[in-house]
Amino acid sequence: MTSQRTRERLIQRLCEEGVSNPKVLDAIRRTPRHLFVDEALAHRAYEDTALPIGHNQTISQPFMVAHMSELLLEAGPLDKVLEIGTGSGYQTAILAQLVERVFSVERIKVLQDRAKERLVELNLRNVVFRWGDGCDGWQALAPYNGIIVTAVAPEVPQALLDQLAPGGRMVIPVGPAGEVQQLMLIVREEQGFSRRVLGAVRFVPLLNGPVA
């Protein structure tokens, strides 16, 4: 289940699906995904599929985690990334190995607490967590040169656009909850924002308000 051979099969699959950034692949290879799912699902941890983590949330499929991370890093190294939707902490753990600092916002307290414990166990200490409404971002620590959103919004929240630094990149799924959505790459340029649609995806909805 957790053997190196099992993880290498996942890496091979990601490469076949088009992931090519060696740093992203190494981070996926090093990260024990089975620690981020319930024990009953641990035997499926290295399948390239999303899995439930409770509270109507999921851990994203490894390909999507790798793809979004790769898009974020496409223009070069990042030192300050905002993650909206900590969830299990798996995407957080990948980012923590790729960028200097991660600031992660989660609205469901129990999920955030579990994610914190997992990252401490993995000795990933360059992450700061906030329990709150992800739609608001984290204005107090803005701007960010990367923003990654792990839940779908009907439209891009203005607060997140405002918190993106000049030249910064945001990867976000946009569209109606429960239907086919579009993954978008947004770049803050001198004259405004450029937007590139990257393909169809399906994510859980980005909801308002923290939950204890």
From Swiss-Prot:
Catalytic activity: [protein]-L-isoaspartate + S-adenosyl-L-methionine = [protein]-L-isoaspartate alpha-methyl ester + S-adenosyl-L-homocysteine
EC number: 2.1.1.77
Molecular function via GO: protein-L-isoaspartate (D-aspartate) O-methyltransferase activity
One Pfam assignment: PCMT
Intrachain S-S bonds: none
Coarse class of the protein's main subcellular location: cytoplasm
GO BP terms in the entry: methylation; protein modification process; protein repair
InterPro entries the UniProt entry points to: PCMT, SAM-dependent_MTases_sf
Active site, renumbered: S60
Gene Ontology terms: cellular component: cytoplasm
Locations listed in the record: Cytoplasm
Keywords: Cytoplasm, Methyltransferase, S-adenosyl-L-methionine, Transferase
Broad enzyme group: transferase
HAMAP family: PIMT (MF_00090)
NCBIfam families the UniProt entry points to: pimt, PRK00312.1
Protein's job: Catalyzes the methyl esterification of L-isoaspartyl residues in peptides and proteins that result from spontaneous decomposition of normal L-aspartyl and L-asparaginyl residues. It plays a role in the repair and/or degradation of damaged proteins.
Family, similarity comment: Belongs to the methyltransferase superfamily. L-isoaspartyl/D-aspartyl protein methyltransferase family.
Record's protein name: Protein-L-isoaspartate O-methyltransferase
Native source organism of the sequence: Pseudomonas putida (strain W619)
Gene: pcm
